[in-house]
């Protein structure tokens, strides 16, 4: 699963020598080289009998914690020219934004945000898409595609300007269609993406002390958010 690969590739820099980092690089090439003609990416690949797009896992893969983390920590950006056009097609042709510039939730082949219950898919989608744009912008700058970088930056500004007003209910981030308990995963992603203003951190800390829905996969981001918050409180 590429969601797991995203978490594992960052761990590899702490436990494996540089030869081990090549595993993630190979995975990146495989994922993008098997991109479907319409632009969708999916995993596991290659596969003869089961290959499905889990939209949020794919956003995680191409984004800040996935492809960008691999490039930054290995200091090897050699894969970027090979995957950039496919990444751009996925983020801007497969994915769509609404009139306010916010990403539209997609079902893909399997609409999956995490194990368990109380998954706020809309907030998670917005955060993962924002982080994917953040990575894409860095790659555009690396390739000196300044027009692309400026366009991506404008998209990020629009999302950042709308996020708090759309999802903050006075106590936590929730989408209007989410009927379950407040999703700790969504709060975590709001923090680590940078979309949650620092002024919300104290309230979010209360949410993290109450809500425990994340699986080990998403708990990584809950823990990271807690570290970021506790640097201030």
Regions found by a protein language model. Give the residues of each.
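Active-site core of glycosidic bond-cleaving carbohydrate-active enzymes
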Residues: 2-232
């Amino acid at each position: 699963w590429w969601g797991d690969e995203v978490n594992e590739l960052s761990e590899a820099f702490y436990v494996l020598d540089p030869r081990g980092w090549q595993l993630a690089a190979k995975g990146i090439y495989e994922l993008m080289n098997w991109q479907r003609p319409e632009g969708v990416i999916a995993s596991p690949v290659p596969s003869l009998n089961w290959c499905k797009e889990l939209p949020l896992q794919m956003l995680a893969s191409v984004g800040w914690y996935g492809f960008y983390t691999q490039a930054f920590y290995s200091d090897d950006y050699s894969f970027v020219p090979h995957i950039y056009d496919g990444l751009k097609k996925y983020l801007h042709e497969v994915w769509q934004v609404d009139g306010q510039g916010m990403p539209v939730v997609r079902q893909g082949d399997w609409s999956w945000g995490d194990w368990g219950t109380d998954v706020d898919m809309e907030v998670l989608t917005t955060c993962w898409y924002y982080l994917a744009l953040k990575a894409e912008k860095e790659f555009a700058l690396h390739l000196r595609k300044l027009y692309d970088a400026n366009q991506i930056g404008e998209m990020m500004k629009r999302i950042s300007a709308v996020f708090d007003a759309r999802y903050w209910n006075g106590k936590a981030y929730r989408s209007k269609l989410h009927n379950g308990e407040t999703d700790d995963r969504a709060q975590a992603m709001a923090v680590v993406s940078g979309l949650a203003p620092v002024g919300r951190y104290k309230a979010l800390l209360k949410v993290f002390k109450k809500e425990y829905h994340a699986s080990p996969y998403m708990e990584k981001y809950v823990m990271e958010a807690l570290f970021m918050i506790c640097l201030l409180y």
